[in-house]
């Protein structure tokens, strides 16, 4: 037979095989050449049939199917993945999955299932993933999962499970991920997880747990994530996590925890994220957080913490994000942040702080962003930022600040965002150095609200940045004198502006009574019709303008660069997406 006849025969066989392969694709479904079948739409009210015999992936989504009869999958024994989600499915017959021995992934999520037949899964003992989330299941039984020795992931969140029977997971020895979140159970047996030695992720969030029995997690030596947030937990047993040395993420937020037992976190060397926000903590004992050499994030906002003692976080030398906002902090010990040499984000806003020690940030050499807004700060020590040269963002808005020390920001070359608005700034002559610095660094104030004078009454409501430099003198009795002692050194602010303005403000009142007749008229006008003094003032004004323009341009460039570098880090200040 000639070669061309062989080729024609081969093509004919392939065409015949292809037609056989896709023969029987239901009209309401689409069948692809990759053995994938998808059936979607509200018009589907019963299981489509016949299904292609070679189907390996079947998706039935968003239909009005309410029941799954027996033997509907007998002719598709090669099926590997079955996804029946977002239907009206309320009843599944016991033999519905017969002949699906090759099935690896089964999802029945987002249906209306209340009960499952005990032997429903007996023919799919090779399953690796089983998703039963967001149904209305009220109970699960040990026999339902007895044949799943290969199961890796079991999702049961979003049901109405009132309790978890002891032994229900005993045969799931290969399970690595178990989600029981958003159910209604109130307690756990201490032995319910005793055979899950390979479990890596356990999620128990959004239940009504008030107590976790000692030993509940002892068998979970490979656990990496434990989610217990949004329960009603009031106390934690001291050794509750001692056998979970591989734990990396621990979520305890939005509970009723009022006290952390000493040593509760002592055996967690690999932990990198710990959330405790939304609890009732009143104090932090020194050493309660440690040693945890890999911890990167510690979230403590929205508690009732009133003070921070020395060395509260001294064992967390790799910590990068510390969130303490929305507490009742009124005192921070000078050594509270000892050991936090790698901290980059510190949130202290919305507390009751009135004063801060000048050394409180001295060990935070790598700090990039600090938020102090919404406190009651009356003043800041001049040295408070002395050792944090890399600061990019400082938020001081909505405090009780009337002035700031001379040169407090001068060494912060990377500073690109400074918030000072909503403070009662007192715009007398003492504010001049800050005023002059703000003029040269206006770009760092951003585009939102600028700081506004609160007093004296003559300048109330005027912007501290653009107000006329002829401020009223300080409110003292007697003749006005230069306020030299208020600032140890005037060299850190622009000399020309501050000196000329101060000279005008503090001019002796005797000048007003000088006998003009005793002064010899001197005509020292130059070629532009101005006196030498006038020429000097004009030149000085031009120089000041050029310097101010150059500094503002440099600040803008710095700000743009800083914001790009800090964007990824700033994103960490947002509340965490826990599970």
UniProtKB/Swiss-Prot annotation:
Segments of this protein annotated with the region Disordered: 476-509
GO molecular function: collagen binding; fibronectin binding; laminin binding; protein sequestering activity
Stretches assigned to the LRRCT domain: 423-473
Keyword Cell cycle recorded: no
Tissue specificity note: Expressed in chodrocytes (at protein level).
LRR repeats: 54-75, 78-99, 102-123, 126-147, 150-171, 174-195, 198-219, 222-243, 246-267, 270-291, 294-315, 318-339, 342-363, 366-387, 390-411
Pfam family for this entry, one: LRR_8
Range of residues in the leader sequence: 1-21
Sugar-bearing residue positions: 75, 369
Main subcellular localisation: membrane
Entry-linked Gene3D superfamilies: Ribonuclease Inhibitor
GO cellular component terms listed in the entry, alphabetical order: apical plasma membrane; plasma membrane
This protein's name: Leucine-rich repeat-containing protein 15
Record gene name: Lrrc15
């Amino acid at each position: 037979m000639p070669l061309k006849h062989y080729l024609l025969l081969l093509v004919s066989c392939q065409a015949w095989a292809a037609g056989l392969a896709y023969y029987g694709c239901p009209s309401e479904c689409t069948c692809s050449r990759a053995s994938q079948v998808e059936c979607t739409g509200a018009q589907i009210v019963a299981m489509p049939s016949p299904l292609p015999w070679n189907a390996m992936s079947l998706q039935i989504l968003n239909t009005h199917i309410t029941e799954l009869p027996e033997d509907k999958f007998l002719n598709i024994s090669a099926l590997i993945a079955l996804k029946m989600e977002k239907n009206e499915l309320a009843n599944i017959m016991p033999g519905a999955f017969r002949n699906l021995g090759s099935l690896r992934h089964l999802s029945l999520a987002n249906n209306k299932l209340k009960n499952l037949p005990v032997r429903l899964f007996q023919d799919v003992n090779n399953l690796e993933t089983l998703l039963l989330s967001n149904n209305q299941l009220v109970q699960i039984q040990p026999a339902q999962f007895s044949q799943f020795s290969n199961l890796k992931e079991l999702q049961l969140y979003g049901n109405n499970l009132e309790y978890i029977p002891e032994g229900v997971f005993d045969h799931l020895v290969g399970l690595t991920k178990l989600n029981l979140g958003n159910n209604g159970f109130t307690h756990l047996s201490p032995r319910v997880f005793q055979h899950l030695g390979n479990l890596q992720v356990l999620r128990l969030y959004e239940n009504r747990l008030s107590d976790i029995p000692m030993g509940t997690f002892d068998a979970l030596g490979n656990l990496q994530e434990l989610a217990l947030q949004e329960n009603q937990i009031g106390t934690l047993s001291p050794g509750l996590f001692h056998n979970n040395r591989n734990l990396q993420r621990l979520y305890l937020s939005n509970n009723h925890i009022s006290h952390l037992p000493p040593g509760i976190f002592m055996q967690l060397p690999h932990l990198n994220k710990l959330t405790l926000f939304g609890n009732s903590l009143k104090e932090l004992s020194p050493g309660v957080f440690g040693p945890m050499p890999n911890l990167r994030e510690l979230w403590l906002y929205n508690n009732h913490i009133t003070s921070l003692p020395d060395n509260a976080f001294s064992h967390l030398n790799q910590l990068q994000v510390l969130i303490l906002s929305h507490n009742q902090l009124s005192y921070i010990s000078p050594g509270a942040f000892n050991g936090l040499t790698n901290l980059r984000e510190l949130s202290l806003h919305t507390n009751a702080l009135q004063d801060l020690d000048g050394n409180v940030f001295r060990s935070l050499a790598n700090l990039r962003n600090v938020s102090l807004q919404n406190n009651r700060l009356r003043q800041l020590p001049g040295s408070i930022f002395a050792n944090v040269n890399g600061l990019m963002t400082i938020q001081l808005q909505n405090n009780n600040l009337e002035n700031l020390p001379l040169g407090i920001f001068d060494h912060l070359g990377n500073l690109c965002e400074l918030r000072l608005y909503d403070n009662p700034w007192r715009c007398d002559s003492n504010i001049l150095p800050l005023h002059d610095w703000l003029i040269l660094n206006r770009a760092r104030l951003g585009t939102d609200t600028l700081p506004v004078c609160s007093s004296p009454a003559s300048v109330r409501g005027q912007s501290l940045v653009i107000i006329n430099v002829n401020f009223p003198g300080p409110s003292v009795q007697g003749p006005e004198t230069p306020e030299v002692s208020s600032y140890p050194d005037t060299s850190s602010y622009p000399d020309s502006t501050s000196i000329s303005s101060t000279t005008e403000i503090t001019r002796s009142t005797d000048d007003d009574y000088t006998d003009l007749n005793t002064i010899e008229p001197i005509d020292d006008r130059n070629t532009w019709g101005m006196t030498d003094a006038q020429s000097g003032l004009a030149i000085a004004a031009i120089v000041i303008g050029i310097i101010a323009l150059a500094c503002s341009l440099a600040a803008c460039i710095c700000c743009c660069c800083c914001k790009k570098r800090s964007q990824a880090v700033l994103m960490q200040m947002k509340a965490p997406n826990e599970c």
